[in-house]
């Protein structure tokens, strides 16, 4: 009879035949396989592919940026695509002299300067205005005002002197006039400023006065004969016949051979 042998399996003593995978090795196998597959995803070939994808995505971003240009920061000027204009265009709107206006200024300019310009004498109304302003600041009524009151007195007359102008006037009064001025000295100080202020403020009344200096017969028109007659006294020199004819032709807007007051005013206007 065959003898039965009781075989006891001792843990760890059993040998595993070749070709048979133990449960532990089987568990490790997939883990090794997973690590291997992860390493394969880091293969240089895959890096090249990913870099190619990045380059393609960067290219798409670059193409998209060309469609949508970057915004300009606040305070930064946008580049102008329009071509720069030549420098000559900057001065294309300069004021061009008008022959008619030049002729009028040449004819009537000396008269107006003598009557209403910087070299004219003050009229009675202007002297009365200065007298009233002087008396307002002569508080003790002794006929003098101090240099400290000159600035306020000038402002009362409508002038706005600068600090430098006030300093010059004050120094002049203190050093040469003892710090006080009487009315005559006050007029000497103020009249140049007054003439300068009104030299370019000719009203209708002043223009009519100048017009009557030429219009001797008071018919409201200036003829060639009247222009020739008034020229030596008003302009300081006689005018030749051809020069008179040319001047009258340039200033005679309606072509009637004479200059009326409207034409006189229009030719003297500096528009």
Curated annotation (Swiss-Prot):
An example Gene Ontology biological process: photoreceptor cell morphogenesis
One Gene Ontology CC term in the entry: presynapse
Binding site for Ca(2+) 3: 252, 254, 256, 258, 263
Binding annotation for Ca(2+) 2: 215, 217, 219, 221, 226
Keywords recorded for this protein, A-Z: Calcium, Cell projection, Cytoplasm, Metal-binding, Phosphoprotein, Repeat, Synapse
Major place of residence: cytoplasm
Low complexity: bias regions: 45-67
Family matches, as InterPro entries: CaBP1/2/4/5 (IPR043582), EF-hand-dom_pair (IPR011992), EF_Hand_1_Ca_BS (IPR018247), EF_hand_dom (IPR002048)
Residues the record lists as Phosphoserine modifications: 37
Location within or outside the cell: Cytoplasm; Presynapse
Region of interest (Disordered), residue spans: 1-105
Residue ranges with Basic residues bias: 87-96
Outcome of mutating residue 263 to Q: Loss of calcium binding
Pfam families documented for this protein: EF-hand_1, EF-hand_7
Function as written in the Swiss-Prot or TrEMBL entry: Involved in normal synaptic function through regulation of Ca(2+) influx and neurotransmitter release in photoreceptor synaptic terminals and in auditory transmission. Modulator of CACNA1D and CACNA1F, suppressing the calcium-dependent inactivation and shifting the activation range to more hyperpolarized voltages.
SUBUNIT field: Interacts with CACNA1F and CACNA1D (via IQ domain) in a calcium independent manner. Interacts (via N-terminus) with UNC119.
Name of the protein in its database record: Calcium-binding protein 4
Organism expressing this protein natively: Mus musculus (Mouse)
